[in-house]
């Protein structure tokens, strides 16, 4: 199990820094970003209180290594983008990394998260460790329900984010059942789903990022995270019915 975890973590690191550098594009089909689920608390606090606090709660794929890693990772980029698109709004994005925790582990920490951080929105990034450890899908679903219920009862908005895509990990780990469970739970709980698995699959299919490649180029890692941040910012603004200043990702 430790060997599998280590190997999978290495592959996730590799795919995060792999890209087609000469033809970099952040294009994401609308159907993967925009749905009918709303972020009502985000709408209210932005319009009434002129502020927004977001917690990115999840595994290590929300972070980047190196001295410039924190500033280049998608939570920091998301904060920068929302500040640009929502002038006059005090935006804060707090990354809370919980490496190697299952959805159940994270659900147990939701009440403390709400009490400590007082977020308006939680981006709950999960699924990978459950798939690696082959947690029963029904147990995974129950954990998602538990965590979302705690957040919704506190008045906090939620976005679910599923796992990363890599052609190599498809062979090693069965991500599909867990991604399907997250889609069902998101629909039933009426929360947006940032379908990172399908989005990265799209980038792989279109050649925007070569997810078979690997290396240690921090610039390429930043490009992947920048694209994720752009997609997440677009989803938040749409679901909260906010017209932000238009900022397109660098091509």
PLM regions: where:
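Bacterial N-terminal signal peptides
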Residues: 6-16
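Boundary at the C-terminal end of the N-terminal hydrophobic targeting segment
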Residues: 18-23
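Serine-esterase "nucleophile elbow" of acetyl-processing enzymes
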Residues: 24-96, 112-118
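Active-site segments of SGNH/GDSL-like serine hydrolases
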Residues: 125-128, 148-179
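Catalytic His-Asp segment of secreted/periplasmic serine-dependent ester chemistry enzymes
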Residues: 165-251
């Amino acid at each position: 199990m430790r060997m599998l975890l280590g190997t999978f973590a290495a592959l996730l690191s590799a795919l995060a820094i792999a890209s087609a550098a000469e033809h970099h594009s952040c294009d994401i089909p609308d159907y993967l970003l925009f749905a009918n689920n709303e972020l009502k608390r985000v709408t209210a606090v932005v319009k009434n209180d002129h502020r927004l606090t977001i917690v990115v709660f999840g595994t290590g794929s929300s972070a980047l290594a190196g001295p410039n890693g924190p500033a280049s990772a998608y939570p920091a980029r998301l904060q920068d983008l929302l500040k640009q698109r929502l002038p006059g709004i005090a935006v804060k994005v707090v990354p809370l990394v919980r490496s190697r925790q299952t959805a159940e582990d994270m659900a147990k920490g939701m009440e403390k998260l709400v009490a400590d951080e007082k977020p308006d929105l939680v981006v709950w990034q999960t699924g990978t460790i459950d798939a690696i450890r082959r947690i029963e899908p029904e147990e995974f679903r129950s954990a998602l329900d538990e965590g979302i219920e705690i957040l919704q009862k506190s008045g906090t908005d939620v976005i679910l984010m599923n796992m990363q895509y890599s052609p190599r990990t498809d062979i090693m780990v069965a991500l599909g059942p867990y991604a399907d469970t997250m889609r069902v739970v998101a629909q039933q709980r009426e929360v947006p789903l940032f379908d990172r698995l399908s989005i990265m699959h799209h980038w792989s299919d279109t050649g925007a990022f070569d997810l078979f490649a690997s290396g240690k180029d921090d610039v390429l890692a930043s490009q992947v995270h920048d694209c994720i941040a752009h997609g997440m910012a677009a989803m938040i603004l749409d679901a909260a019915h906010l017209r932000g200043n238009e900022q397109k990702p660098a091509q």
